[in-house]
Amino acid sequence: MSQNKLAALIILDGFAIRDEVKGNAVKQANTPNFDRFWNQYAHNQLEASGKAVGLPDGQMGNSEVGHLNIGAGRIVYQSLTRVNVSIDEGDFYEVDAFIKSVEHAKKHDKALHLFGLLSDGGVHSHINHLFALLRLAKKHELENVFVHAFLDGRDVGPKTASKYIKETQDVMDELGVGQFATISGRYYSMDRDKRWDRVKKCYDAMVYGEGPSYKSAQEVVDDNYANEIYDEFVIPSVITDDNDEPVATIKDEDSIIFYNFRPDRAIQISRTFANEDFRDFERGDKAPKKLDFVMLTNFSETVDGYVAYQPVNLDNTVGEVLAQNNLNQLRIAETEKYPHVTFFMSGGREKEFPGEKRILIDSPKVATYDLKPEMSVYEVTDALLKELDKGEQNAIILNFANPDMVGHSGKLQPTIDAIEAVDECLGKVIDKITELGGHAIITADHGNSDEVMTLEDKPMTAHTTNPVPVIVTKDDIELRDGGILADLSPTLLDLLNVEKPKEMTGNSLIKK
């Protein structure tokens, strides 16, 4: 195979197709380059949610799920689906890591702390998994069970915390097990960009009982709302008892079960509790030691602890197939989506394949990306164009983060600005690839920026279930209907004249 063979997979993160113009940044943005490629080349749309990506029917897709399905070239049944089935069939209550955790707490008269994202968004966690853990604690007759709730407001509506707090309180009251101990917005507890000052605020509330104090979880929300601070950004707060003491703090040898299933935003805070050698901030003299730490799924090799649900092994992902065929590949993205084009695209593998190069461009250090809608798209593009000029790569996997990351703000104009910046860069990248005799697949992993405001003009910060576009920049071809994300890697391999492996049950979108 000639070394000048070139094909690219370009993922416009959070960019989907929706007819309604109102609240739709994709429709309202000026996108001359995307429109040019859509009109010039074969195009269609792909399902990127629900059963098409291994999620429950009607469940919106997300970046982790999307990149896993894309890279695997097959439908990958997601952790949400696996755990739901496990609860329904009763296996959940027999999982070794859970049993050891509750038995450890019971035997040593220690507390069991349950923490995770408190919503039914289904992107990072699901509240039903917390309820199942509370039932497990009840079954084992545990008394000291505490919930450290991370409020969402991003994968669900921005002001929905009260609903989830009430649902959780009702379950705890019904079972006679569990109390809220701390409440934090996910902005603090689930940072993934090394903003350790945020994580420390959450840690200090959970370990030292430091932070604003309230008598109930609902009071935390009410007070923050009064100051126009909504779910995602709620300041880490401590629930106190009748003596104004914290209901619970995390102490030596306590048990912790972290019920998020998606790794990327769970890693940093996990390391603060699980890793004895943690050094990213000073944890203080009373940092709890010898904790029994359980992750719902395998968050990372960098987190010490037990894993409840081990990953499903994915062989022959697109990166592995490219390496087997002695083709060079480049993975490039800015920080926010770097794990997606590397770890998730490779089926949960951290290490590069032979011939794989990775370029990480730092995302801008701003509080929220609506303040800088272009993010680092120009820097990503410049780095890629330089790499293309070298002529060393055969396959490019590129992610433009902006439509998703700015779309999460629920602010229409910044999201339009984000998409227009991406469109400018998309034009440069495709023109360069075409000049070099290569082809590209332009697509997305899920919806978001296609619905930033509701029809009632309220911010819509969650993903959507809308189909995503696919364009293949090759003349004289047609694309078939009925495509899903799992068909993208077989299509990329097709452009490179590489046979797809039997493990890839997806099929090339190019009509034969």
From Swiss-Prot:
Ligand binding (Mn(2+) 2): D13, S63, D445, H446
Its EC number(s): 5.4.2.12
Domain of life: Bacteria
Residues that, per the record, bind substrate: H124, R154, D155, R186, R192, R262, P263, D264, R265, K337
Free-text remark on how the cofactor is bound: Binds 2 manganese ions per subunit.
Gene3D superfamilies: Alkaline Phosphatase, subunit A (3.40.720.10), BPG-independent phosphoglycerate mutase, domain B (3.40.1450.10)
Pfam families the UniProt entry points to: iPGM_N, Metalloenzyme
InterPro entries reported in the protein's UniProt record: Alkaline_phosphatase_core_sf (IPR017850), BPG-indep_PGM_N (IPR011258), Metalloenzyme (IPR006124), PGAM_B_sf (IPR036646), Pgm_bpd_ind (IPR005995)
Gene Ontology MF annotations: manganese ion binding; phosphoglycerate mutase activity
GO biological process: glucose catabolic process; glycolytic process; sporulation resulting in formation of a cellular spore
Annotated GO CC locations: cytosol
Key words, A-Z: Glycolysis, Isomerase, Manganese, Metal-binding, Phosphoprotein, Sporulation
Annotated metabolic or biological route of this protein: Carbohydrate degradation; glycolysis; pyruvate from D-glyceraldehyde 3-phosphate: step 3/5
Disulfide bonds: none
Broad class of enzyme this protein falls into: isomerase
Binding residues for Mn(2+) 1: D404, H408, H463
UniProt function note: Essential for rapid growth and for sporulation. Catalyzes the interconversion of 2-phosphoglycerate and 3-phosphoglycerate.
Similarity field: Belongs to the BPG-independent phosphoglycerate mutase family.
Name of the protein this chain belongs to: 2,3-bisphosphoglycerate-independent phosphoglycerate mutase
Species for this entry: Oceanobacillus iheyensis (strain DSM 14371 / CIP 107618 / JCM 11309 / KCTC 3954 / HTE831)
